[in-house]
Amino acid sequence: MILMQPLSSLSKVGVILRPSSPSLKEFFLQVRSLFEREGIEVMLDSISGGMIGIYGCDFQRLCSESDMLVSIGGDGTLISVVRRSYPYGKPILGINMGRLGFLTDVRQDEVEAFVQKLKAGEYRIDSRLMLEGELSSPKGTQRFFAFNEAIVTRRPISGMIHVKASIGEEPFNTYFGDGLIVATPTGSTAYNISAGGPVVYPYSKNMILTPICAHSLTQRPLVLPSEFEVELEMLEGEFANIVVDGQEIMDFGYGDRLRLKVAERPALLVHKKEHNYFQVLREKFSWGDA
């Protein structure tokens, strides 16, 4: 789903910088000046502020008071901001300072012109499906949200793992191998594609299940509609890990259960009006090159 309507007003933005990058101070000052020139107030989160020696506010206040969040870094920074700010439902603009820039499509040299377009309402807001996870174990229940994927994976020096998968209350498969990826359409071009999973249009409402190095030639990726809930259970073998968007890790042991479903609300990403997903695929993956 694509939301073509911009915000009714844009008076304040909250900025989050890529961690461990104090060299971003000069660029942040430039970005702040560009927004302020358009009459838009700029807030900075406290962790970013401490990194570059400028006052910042706590993340909760930043999200609550801002009309839009601005992530300055790479795709990893944007994903972190999406996950942390998800309860607040704010649209997020990604300025690309990284290598890939699959999600952060505004380059450094485009910022000045794009800030003017933001003020004029000449942009679009895309909605991206999120996953909601619930891990039940003897330690209790942990809930989380995933933007790209949740992965059940063996530990670095352990053997293969055995995972039972059910759709709703119906068991449908067991996976024996290095792990299993449950990805969103947005995450289909991340770890999922490296493991042989399909590319799924990011505005589709699906979940993708892709085995990692399965010990069977018949184990293949599966695309499910969004109304299904997937339950994963460890059957035997050593402890495994659950890795969420490459940024959060949890233990997953014998008898533990992981439930995954499509979250009630999507994440909101700010893009140029002319943003074209298939053009991004061609450029980032070098598709069509002779």
Curated annotation (Swiss-Prot):
Superkingdom to which the source organism belongs: Bacteria
Positions bound to NAD(+): 75-76, 148-149, 178, 189-194, 247
Reactions catalysed according to its record: NAD(+) + ATP = ADP + NADP(+) + H(+)
Pfam hit, one: NAD_kinase
SUPFAM superfamilies in alphabetical order: NAD kinase/diacylglycerol kinase-like
Main location: cytoplasm
InterPro entries: ATP-NAD_kinase_N, ATP-NAD_kinase_PpnK-typ_C, NAD/diacylglycerol_kinase_sf, NADK
Top EC group: transferase
GO molecular function, one term: ATP binding
One GO CC annotation: cytoplasm
Subcellular location per the Swiss-Prot or TrEMBL entry: Cytoplasm
GO biological process: NAD metabolic process; NADP biosynthetic process
Cofactor field: a divalent metal cation
Keyword NAD in annotation: yes
Active site residues of this protein: 75
E.C. no: 2.7.1.23
Keyword field: ATP-binding, Cytoplasm, Kinase, NAD, NADP, Nucleotide-binding, Transferase
Cited function: Involved in the regulation of the intracellular balance of NAD and NADP, and is a key enzyme in the biosynthesis of NADP. Catalyzes specifically the phosphorylation on 2'-hydroxyl of the adenosine moiety of NAD to yield NADP.
PANTHER family per the UniProt record, alphabetical: NAD KINASE
Family: Belongs to the NAD kinase family.
HAMAP family: NAD_kinase
Protein name: NAD kinase
Source organism of the structure: Wolinella succinogenes (strain ATCC 29543 / DSM 1740 / CCUG 13145 / JCM 31913 / LMG 7466 / NCTC 11488 / FDC 602W) (Vibrio succinogenes)
Phylogenetic classification of the source organism: Bacteria, Pseudomonadati, Campylobacterota, Epsilonproteobacteria, Campylobacterales
Protein encoded by which gene: nadK
